[in-house]
């Protein structure tokens, strides 16, 4: 276990550049899984990723110094995969499978460099875009979000003295540990760390991972952060994300192709992966529409990740669909991951225990819960909902509808077209905090 005095390190911050991104493995595992598929099937596709701050009241460009942000983004572009990292990717087993990454893909990955970016300020916000081939721009999503979130944390703490920083981190540690102790009551619960993109800092995420490892033992199944998985000998976890159906939908040339695009993604995915990686993410264009038109073979997949509906409501919908298709939900897996905290984890676990296999991906409320921890009130330490989504593919606008309309992204006229094709049933407005 690596022990770092985080408060001292923050206070002694006197060097010119303290890199936030130190490795290209400091990303979510599903980015690498998706990248291999994109590299194999869609090398000629362009995709633009764009930053969106859902908390409009937070003026990011007023909180974060633009020169500092550029310096961090520029530094990230200098990083390459190390020999040690490439050997680990080639030789390690993931999800019980050896050589999950092909030698040809790894040979390409060894020379990978993050592409250029475009950054400007407008009305107190940053407009940050990444243009280029999909297999290059996709790798910006996680480091860009981690960089901005950590710069915001650093800016918020800049006025705190050494003693105040000690108090801040002592309270934050106690807050996390109290949550961990609550989870000890459920020895067969399964928890994983999904907190990279909106974390307080890399060092803090590492501490949270160590706390879960120490506190709940085998109930802690691993982390989505590939670098932390390698460094702490944990399982690297993750399946697929909304960007896959968003891009394929944007490339569609007709309403029929658009309607079929989520299922084409699944066909592509199962040509590369199997077993516990066969997890359906149904909500990109609305879960109700997805389930209504899903081919029968989708019911044979290992499980679902109901991401944007309230967890109990979303889980019940999936269980009902499995039963309608003659499948036993007790043999299937539900992965919950949307804005979870210990209260929702406990409630959801108790509700579904014994009815399905369960797993919980704990994100922002694990790795960035500093609200109320400072000796004085600092609003900027409260986590915000920041995303970096596909905004276009081959020049065509991309859309995400979601089960929560507050999470929808895309041009208004395109959102209306997608709603005409997919419908709007059972989409429920909920406030988006993280």
UniProtKB/Swiss-Prot annotation:
InterPro entries registered for this protein in UniProt: N/Namide_PRibTrfase (IPR041525), NAPRTase_N (IPR040727), Nic_PRibTrfase (IPR006406), Nic_PRibTrfase-Fam (IPR007229), Nicotinate_pribotase-like_C (IPR036068)
Post-translational modification: Transiently phosphorylated on a His residue during the reaction cycle. Phosphorylation strongly increases the affinity for substrates and increases the rate of nicotinate D-ribonucleotide production. Dephosphorylation regenerates the low-affinity form of the enzyme, leading to product release.
GO BP terms, alphabetized: NAD biosynthetic process via the salvage pathway
EC number: 6.3.4.21
Protein name (database record): Nicotinate phosphoribosyltransferase
UniProt similarity note: Belongs to the NAPRTase family.
GO cellular component: cytosol
One Pfam entry name: NAPRTase
Keyword Repeat: no
């Amino acid at each position: 276990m690596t022990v770092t005095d985080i408060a001292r390190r923050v206070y002694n911050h006197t060097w010119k550049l303290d890199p936030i991104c130190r490795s290209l493995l400091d990303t979510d595992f599903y980015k690498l899984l998706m990248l291999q598929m994109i590299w194999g099937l869609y090398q000629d596709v362009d995709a633009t990723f764009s930053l969106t701050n859902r908390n409009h009241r937070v003026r990011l460009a007023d909180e974060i110094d633009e020169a500092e942000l550029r310096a961090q983004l520029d530094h990230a572009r200098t990083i390459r995969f190390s020999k040690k990292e490439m050997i680990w990717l080639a030789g390690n087993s993931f999800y019980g499978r050896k050589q999950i990454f092909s030698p040809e893909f790894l040979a390409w990955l060894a020379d990978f460099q993050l592409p250029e970016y475009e950054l400007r300020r407008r009305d107190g916000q940053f407009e940050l875009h990444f243009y280029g081939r999909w297999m290059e721009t996709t790798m910006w999503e996680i480091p860009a979000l981690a960089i901005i979130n950590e710069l915001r944390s650093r800016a918020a703490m800049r006025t705190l003295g050494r003693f105040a920083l000690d108090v801040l981190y002592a309270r934050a540690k106690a807050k996390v540990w109290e949550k961990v102790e609550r989870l000890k009551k459920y020895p067969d619960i399964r928890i994983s760390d999904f907190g990279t993109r909106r974390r307080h800092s890399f060092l803090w995420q590492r501490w949270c991972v160590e706390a879960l490892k120490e506190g709940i033992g085998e109930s802690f199944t691993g982390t989505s952060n590939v670098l932390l998985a390698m460094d702490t000998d944990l399982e690297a976890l993750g399946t697929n994300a909304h960007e896959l159906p968003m891009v394929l939908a944007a490339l569609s040339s007709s309403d029929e192709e658009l309607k079929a695009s989520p299922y084409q993604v699944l066909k592509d995915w199962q040509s590369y992966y199997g077993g516990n990686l066969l997890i359906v993410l149904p909500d990109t264009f609305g879960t109700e529409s997805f389930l209504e038109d899903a081919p029968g073979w989708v019911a044979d997949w290992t499980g679902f990740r109901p991401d944007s509906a309230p967890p109990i409501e979303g889980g019940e919908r999936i269980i009902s669909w499995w039963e309608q298709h003659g499948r036993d939900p007790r043999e299937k897996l539900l992965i919950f991951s949307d804005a979870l905290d210990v209260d929702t984890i406990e409630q959801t676990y108790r509700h579904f225990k014994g009815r399905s296999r369960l797993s919980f991906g704990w994100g922002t409320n694990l790795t960035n819960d500093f609200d109320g921890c400072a000796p004085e009130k600092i609003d900027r330490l409260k986590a915000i909902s920041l995303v970096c989504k596909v905004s276009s593919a081959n020049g065509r606008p991309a859309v995400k509808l979601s089960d929560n309309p507050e999470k929808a992204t895309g041009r208004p006229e395109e959102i209306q077209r997608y709603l005409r094709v997919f419908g709007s049933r059972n989409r429920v407005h909920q406030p988006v905090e993280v």
